[in-house]
Structures are given as structure tokens and as C-alpha cells.
Amino acid sequence: MRFRLAVLAATGALACAGEPARTDAPARPAVEYLPMTGGDRLPFSAAARVGSMLYLSGQIGNDSALRLVPGGIGPETRQTMENIRAILARSGATLDDVIRCTVMMADMKEWGAMNQVYAGFFPRHRPARSAFGATGLALGARVEIECIALVPPA
């Protein structure tokens, strides 16, 4: 009787041990980071690519010397979009590859002026988009835009 109980207990213990770890689990996709140009002192990348997805960091209307362009929301939005276009080009993509944007604005009353410039950069399609008011944008910017693009294979 004791032998049967011991065998039963051992069988139960083995059954509870579970499956061995799987070795055929899919590999984690590689992440490629696109460095900032001229901004090595900044603690973030211009974009990160995972497979065919390109995630751009938020961009503001700064020039190559990292100074905000003068003139308010219109010129800032134009420069922001040009900065986005340049990052996309470094990854072999264009604005036509953008599928989503998030717009942060210091003053939502400037919505119309921002939209007028923004829309000119997407004449063939309009990416999905969210927008909200935000305080404390970098360098006192009026607008910051981040995008996600579906990019051609590397």
C-alpha cells in the first residue's frame, strides 16, 4: 500500500512539474535607433525602427543649430514638418509612408493656422491623428509633432 502511495505521489509531482521551456519561441525583433543629427547631447534618438515600423520622436520647429525658428505657429509647423521629412528620408521613407501623427500645441486657439500648414504636407493621404494642448514644450515651441511610418524593407 505504501509503495502505491509513493508511486502515486511521484506521478502527481511529475505531472505538476509542467512543460520544459520552449526553445522555438519567436525571436524578439531587432530595434534600430536612428541618432539625432547634430544633437549628440540629447538623450533620445530621432527615431526607432522595428521591422517595417518607424517611430519618430516628437519634432519641433528648430533649425540645424537647435534654435526655434521665429514667426510663430505657421513657420514652426512648417519647420517641424521639414524636420520630420528629413528623418523619414534618412530611413528611406517619405511623408507618404506616415500612417499616424500626434500633435501637441501650446495654444489650441492656433489650431487653424497649424492645420493649414500641416495639411499641405499630406496632399495624397491624411494619416490618423490626435492633437491636444500641452504646456512646457521644448525651447518654448508652439507645436510638437511625432509620427509613425510604415517604411520600405531595409
What do the predicted segments below correspond to?
Residues 5-9, 16-82, 86-96, 105-154:
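N-terminal presequence-like segments and the immediate start of the first folded domain
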